[in-house]
């Protein structure tokens, strides 16, 4: 029996322009059924426009949008098997919780007894089974967010689109809701497409992340792949904190930066090719200055609760960010040490296709 590998959502060469301003630039995107995807990027990068294009609220200027293999560019939003949870939830204050959840079903003239059954089931999914009669003004922000999700799920979509739904919540509730959303997606087994500018949310919840900037998808992959193997300077800086240092790839598995040669885990580049070297702050260990692979001088530090964030400089005036469980004195020279696999080498201006091909080539060797 053949396995259906066709993506549930596919965008092919999709662009969107407003006059001369191009919001989306040749977007190609495949979403498989049953996974949690995140579009991650700064404000104005085009991530919400992609969401609206899939939902049918925005028309693509060019390119094709597919759902289960069928082009849906001209299909009205209310006929698409997707539902959207908006940033402001868009709940009706004059309706109670159950009435809000039932609203879409009533518009579609679903029989009353079926409405009651589906509303109760949807509320139970989001742990609000006992709050159906509550007014919207009587429930918390986190509960309002769950009502908005229940209202979308009650329509039994194949894809749920979520447009920064956690942004209005406080830090603790936002973290709690990350767990709840991930658990809900896994229990339901439907496709979630989540939009956020918060890299912590993306890393915590996603099966796959697409990092965007200026209307383009720069890199897609698992959270671990995106974090450990960023394709370029923007991705490395946007996904977590990074030390990014100019360097030179001497040969496979050997790189030079700050005037020294180091063993690394990268290959597939030209001898003496100019590169950028990434070292994450948490991968740097502090040792005595005479024992370090690098020597830096501490400039400042902040206590972050479970670690000290130390800013230091080397003799070439490169800034180094270090996360350590031990404090360091300002003005003190310290040694930094790290393992070869902690070094990530990035080519300048490498496309995602070329990046993926290079990784596959040297990982297979």
Curated annotation (Swiss-Prot):
CDD domains: ABC_PotA_N. InterPro entries: AAA+_ATPase, ABC_SmlMolc_Importer, ABC_transporter-like_ATP-bd, ABC_transporter-like_CS, Mo/tungstate-bd_C_term_dom, P-loop_NTPase, PotA-like, PotA_ATP-bd. Residues 9-239 form the ABC transporter domain. It is found in: Cell membrane. GO terms for cellular component: ATP-binding cassette (ABC) transporter complex. ATP binds at residues 41-48. The keyword Nucleotide-binding applies. The complex is composed of two ATP-binding proteins (PotA), two transmembrane proteins (PotB and PotC) and a solute-binding protein (PotD). This is Spermidine/putrescine import ATP-binding protein PotA. It comes from Lactiplantibacillus plantarum (strain ATCC BAA-793 / NCIMB 8826 / WCFS1).
